[in-house]
Amino acid sequence: MELGRTRNVHIVGIGGAGMSAIAELLLKSGFSVSGSDLASGEVIDKLRELGAVVWQGHEAEHVGMSDVVVYSSAVRPESNVEIQAAEKQGIPVIKRDEMLGELMRYKVGICVSGTHGKTTTTAMIATMLLESGQSPTVMIGGVSDYLKGSTVVGEGRHMVIEADEYDRAFLKLTPTIAVVNSLESEHMDTYGTMDNLRDSFAAFANKVPFYGRVICCVDWPEIRSLISRLNRRYTTFGIEEPADVMASDLEACEGGSVFTVEAFGESYPGVRLGVPGRHNVLNALAAFSVGLEIGLPPEKIIAGLGAYTGMRRRFQMKFKGGNGLLVVDDYAHHPSEVKATVKAARHGWKEHRIVAVFQPHLYSRTSEFAVEFGWALSRADAIYVAGIYPSRERTEDFPGVTGELVAEAARKAGAKEVTFEPDSEQLLDSLRQEAGPDTLILFMGAGDITHLATRFASMCADEGTATGAAG
C-alpha cells in the first residue's frame, strides 16, 4: 500500500474508534504513525505495541517531520496547536474521511449510506463476511459485541464502512459497492434543502467505478427517484415495491423475523434474523444483496445473517424479567426510526404493554419534526417525553422549543397516556410505577437517555422487579 511519497502520518485524536482503526491499518501497511490524544487507555497501549508513537495531550512539536496530519470531526482545527503548527510548516492537513477514502483504494470498499439503518446494515455485512471465513476491515459508528467494538482491521480484500452523510463526509470515500439504505429529510443544518441532500446522495452513489454496483432500497420514494440519476450498475431491494431482491412470507416473532428471500428469480426460504422489526428485514436484504454481488454462496449469506446478534443501542435488551418485564434501549432519534422501533416492539411482543420513553435530540430537529415524532410515538400504550438533548446546539437559540411540543403532538395524534417529564429522577420514579408484568419499556434517543435506560435496568434487577438480569 502506497500513498505517493507519504511515509510519516500524524493523527490528532488517535484514540478515537475511527482514528485508531486508521492508525492500525497504516501501521500494518508499513507506514510510520505518530499521534496525540487527550486520553489514554487500552487503545493507545495497543497502538504503541504496534509501533506508533503516541503523546498524551497536544503540542506543536508533536507534528515533527510528518508528511501529513489527519484529524477527526471531534477536533476543532482552529484551536488545535498541532494542526496550526502543521499549516505553518506547509504540511497537508486532512480530515479522517479523506484518508479513509485513500486507503479504500487498495480494498474492495463496501460503503453503507442512508438516513437510517447504516450501522445495523454495516454490522450485518461484517458478520456475514466473518462467518464466511473472510477477514474484512470494518468501521462502524456503533458498538458490536460480536466484533468486540466498532472496528476490525483484517487482512482480507474487503473494507466495510459506515458512510455518514453528515457534513458530506461520505463524498470523500471511494466505494466499489455503495449501499443506499434510505433517504429522507435529515441534517438540514448541513444541507439546507432536500435538493442539496439528494444531490449529495446521487454524487455518492455515482462514485462507484464502472465495475462497481449501487445497491438501493426502492421502498423509499426518494430512492426510486434517485435511480434515474445513476450512471452505474445497480441492484434494487425492498419489501413493498418490486425489486431484484425481496422478502416474502415474512413472519414476526418475539425478538426476530423469519422470511424468504426472492433474489433474481431464485427463492431462499427460512432466513432467520435475531433482531426484530420490518426495518431490520430491509437491512438484511441490503446485506444479502452485497453478499450476492461479491460472490458469497447464498447458504453462507443466510448463515451469516442468522449469526447477527445486534448492536448496542439498536433494540438492545437491557433487562429481561421472568414476569415478562422488558427494558430496551434504542438509538432512534428521527421520526421514521422511532416509528419503526415502536412498530417492532408492537409486532414482536403482541401481548405486552408498550411504554415509550423518548428523548428528543437537537432543538432544531425537535422544532422541525415535532408533529412527526408525535405520530411515530402514538402507537405506544404510554408515552413519556424527556427534556431535549441539545448536543451541539444552544438552548437560548431556540426559545419555546421543548419536549412538550412532541408530547402535545402525540396527544393530537390520539395517544391517551402522554407525559412530558424533563426531570430525570421524576421520570425514573414514574417508570417504576410502569414496571409491571408483560410490559416492554422502550427508551429511545441519541443523547444521554441511554444512561437512564441503564440505570432503570439496574433498578429493575436490584429491586427484584422480576427474576432476570440487566444487560
From Swiss-Prot:
Q: Which GO terms describe its cellular component?
A: cytoplasm
Kind of enzyme, top EC level? ligase
What job does the chain carry out? Answer: Cell wall formation.
Q: Pathway membership of this protein? A: Cell wall biogenesis; peptidoglycan biosynthesis
Q: Mind telling me which Gene3D superfamilies this protein's record contains? A: Mur ligase, C-terminal domain, Mur-like, catalytic domain, NAD(P)-binding Rossmann-like Domain
* Top-level taxonomic group: Bacteria
Protein name in the entry: UDP-N-acetylmuramate--L-alanine ligase
Q: Which UniProt keywords apply?
A: ATP-binding, Cell cycle, Cell division, Cell shape, Cell wall biogenesis/degradation, Cytoplasm, Ligase, Nucleotide-binding, Peptidoglycan synthesis
Record localization: Cytoplasm
Record-linked NCBIfam families:
murC
Catalytically driven reaction(s): UDP-N-acetyl-alpha-D-muramate + L-alanine + ATP = UDP-N-acetyl-alpha-D-muramoyl-L-alanine + ADP + phosphate + H(+)
Alphabetized Pfam families for the sequence: Mur_ligase, Mur_ligase_C, Mur_ligase_M
* Molecular function terms from GO: ATP binding; UDP-N-acetylmuramate-L-alanine ligase activity
Species of origin reads Chlorobaculum parvum (strain DSM 263 / NCIMB 8327) (Chlorobium vibrioforme subsp. thiosulfatophilum)
Per the UniProt record, which residue ranges are transmembrane?
A: none
Where ATP binds, per the record, is at G114, T115, H116, G117, K118, T119, T120
Which GO terms of type biological process are on file?
Answer: cell division; cell wall organization; peptidoglycan biosynthetic process; regulation of cell shape
Q: What is its EC number?
A: 6.3.2.8
Q: Its family?
A: Belongs to the MurCDEF family.
